[in-house]
Amino acid sequence: MTNTIVELFDKITAEQGLGRSLDHEGSANYAVQKTLVKVATDHFIRFGYRRANIAEIALDAGIGKGTIYLHFKNKRELFFSCLIAEKRELLPQLEIIENFPEEERLRAFLEVTFSFALTASLTRALLSRRQDFAALIEEIDATILKNHDQNYTEYLINKLISPVTHNLDTDDKKTITNVINLATLAIGYLPEMAFDLPGQEIRTEEFVRTLAMIIDRGIKNT
């Protein structure tokens, strides 16, 4: 069983085919990898997966094309490593939430993950521009995705849902995690203009807090 968000993150990123974390800060490779991930993230956001070009990424990063392959096996591993780096920015906030009182954890977790879905540029590109990443999606091993979902569901149930629900069986709790996942995906699909329509401006912070509150109360009242 995964006990902490860091353990969950390490377990998921250890899966073959889902990218790799950067070498530890201070290592000889760290600075190069950090630059590559930063530049590659920008290229993937601008051009999508298929049109992003390794040679152009290397050029903008100021290194030789061959150097990329010393750190990342191929373009797919580089892309997923960019996703990992983006998601790793969430860890400090989620680690703090793990120390909250049980009644407060779920809502805080929802607020952070919903906010991430609205602001994480590469994740949003992957969700809202599926046609630009279709080639990548087709390459992913279904077993890897199944393991990823299983580990994430286990964490949500054990750490966030079970402590605040007492009348639900395992299937009910899995259904709740599916709802949370679908809500997060739906937010990722929202275009930025949805929050900036003339006369209908919606503060993203207010939207996130309200949605998290509704889901949190709904779960606790079941």
What spans do the regions from the language model cover?
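Phosphate/oxyanion-binding loops and surfaces in catalytic or ligand/nucleic-acid-binding neighborhoods
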Residues: 89, 116-123, 183-190, 214-222
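Basic, helix-initiating cap at the start of DNA-binding domains
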Residues: 1-47, 51-63, 77
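A conserved beta-strand->loop->alpha-helix hinge within the catalytic CA
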Residues: 56, 101-105, 172-175
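Alpha-helical structural segments
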Residues: 31-42, 46, 60, 77-100, ...
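Amphipathic alpha-helical segments used for helix-helix packing
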Residues: 116-143, 189-194
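Short hydrophobic/aromatic patch on the recognition helix
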Residues: 61-72
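Amphipathic alpha-helical packing segments from all-alpha helical-bundle domains
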Residues: 91, 137-166, 174-178
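Hydrophobic/aromatic-rich alpha-helical bundle segments in the mid-to-C-terminal region
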Residues: 5, 123-128, 164-211
